[in-house]
Swiss-Prot record:
Residues involved in NADP(+) binding: 11-12, 32-33, 39, 54, 75-79, 92, 143, 169, 177
Source organism: Burkholderia pseudomallei (strain 1026b)
Primary role: Catalyzes the interconversion between ADP-D-glycero-beta-D-manno-heptose and ADP-L-glycero-beta-D-manno-heptose via an epimerization at carbon 6 of the heptose.
Gene Ontology MF annotations: ADP-glyceromanno-heptose 6-epimerase activity; NADP binding
Keyword line: Carbohydrate metabolism, Isomerase, NADP
Protein name: ADP-L-glycero-D-manno-heptose-6-epimerase
Catalytic activity: ADP-D-glycero-beta-D-manno-heptose = ADP-L-glycero-beta-D-manno-heptose
Source organism phylogeny: Bacteria, Pseudomonadati, Pseudomonadota, Betaproteobacteria, Burkholderiales
Top-level taxon: Bacteria
InterPro entries with a match to the protein in the record: Epimerase_deHydtase, Heptose_epim, NAD(P)-bd_dom_sf
Active site, UniProt feature: 139, 177
Length: 330
């Protein structure tokens, strides 16, 4: 039976394709927009049955051109939180997603899609409930509005709808994302280019490099998606983070120590890295004051209640694996 992955040449989409391949699934239609042509590299080691441009796909899918489709993993979106073109964002993230959803509902196809923790905006609690949702940018609003649609249609849906609010995802196949790539990716490249990693200094009561995020490995993101794929009776909107807030200092020290280990050098504590100039703190930029989240942490209550009980990688585990993967790509 056919599977479809939108955003298949993107970061999370390509990792889902690869994870499906590792289970023997190759009857996959990959959907994307390859105007940014270098994204093709994310699919070079993957097996797919067909590729379609996103515009052609949604029209053909609505006509049921692909026969029986078991599931759509809808990862395609504009994920640039700095994008200011509201019309583009709403067309790409909201209207397009509605069209894919409508086709899935009409055909009884499982619909697993990418939501975002950006929906929470400046909230201090990260629970999948309306009172904690207050997006700060049009990207977050586009995701929020679609989740609101999902809440309205889910009670009457005859097939699975599962949305995942991704927190700070890092891992292989993100190099095309540029400024929107993970901190781990940028720290890796910065250390190799300059011999040091730069982090923000003290801000809003947090010490240098102590601002925290829920950093989640794309490996775990793919596992959660496949868990729900395997349990089509489970529907809902779920936080998808490690459930653990860790400071940016943890990312930096892990990147530095993993690269040192690859060169046969011993690990250093954060204090030693700072003393040796391997980690440097820069003044917090004025442009980000009042617009910056100093803390995020996914509430996993709903995810665990839905039956996902596997542990999530820590920063130390996941970033170490990722740095070794990046090093192997050089």
């Amino acid at each position: 039976m056919t599977l479809i992955v939108t955003g298949a040449a993107g970061f999370i989409g390509a990792n889902i394709v690869k994870a499906l391949n590792e289970r023997g699934e190759t009857r996959i239609i990959a959907v994307d927009n390859l105007t940014r042509a270098d994204k093709f590299k994310n699919l070079v080691d993957c097996e797919i049955d067909d590729y379609l441009d996103k515009t052609e796909f949604v029209e053909r899918f609505a006509r049921s051109d692909f026969g029986k489709v078991r599931a759509v993993f809808h990862e395609g979106a504009c994920s640039d939180t700095m994008e200011t073109d509201g019309r583009y964002m709403m067309d790409n993230n909201f209207r397009y997603s509605r069209a894919v959803l409508d086709a899935c509902l009409a055909q009884g196809t499982q619909f697993l899609y990418a939501s975002s923790a950006a929906i929470y905006g400046g909230s201090s609690r990260f629970v999948e409930a309306r009172e904690f949702e207050a997006p700060l940018n049009v990207y977050g609003y586009s995701k929020f509005l679609f989740d609101q649609v999902i809440r309205r249609v889910m009670p009457s849906a005859k097939s699975q709808i599962a949305g995942f609010r991704y927190f700070n995802v890092y891992g292989p196949r993100e190099s095309h994302k540029g400024r929107m790539a993970s901190v781990a990716f940028h720290n890796f490249n910065q250390f190799r280019a300059e011999g040091k990693v730069k982090l923000f200094g003290e801000y809003n009561g947090y010490g240098p490099g102590e601002q925290t995020r829920d950093f989640v490995s794309v490996e775990d993101v793919a596992k959660v998606n496949l868990h729900f794929f395997d349990h089509p009776q489970k529907s809902g909107i779920f936080n998808l983070g490690a459930g653990r807030a860790q400071p940016f200092n943890d990312i930096a020290t892990t990147v530095v120590n993993t690269l040192r280990a690859l060169e046969g050098q011993p690990a250093l504590t954060l204090a030693e890295q700072v003393e040796q100039g391997l980690v440097e703190y820069v003044p917090f930029p004025d442009a980000l004051r009042g617009k910056y989240q100093c803390f995020t942490q996914a509430d996993q209550t709903k995810l665990r209640a839905a039956g996902y009980d596997a542990p999530f990688l820590t920063v130390q585990e996941g970033v170490d694996r990722y740095v070794r993967w990046l090093f192997g790509q050089l």
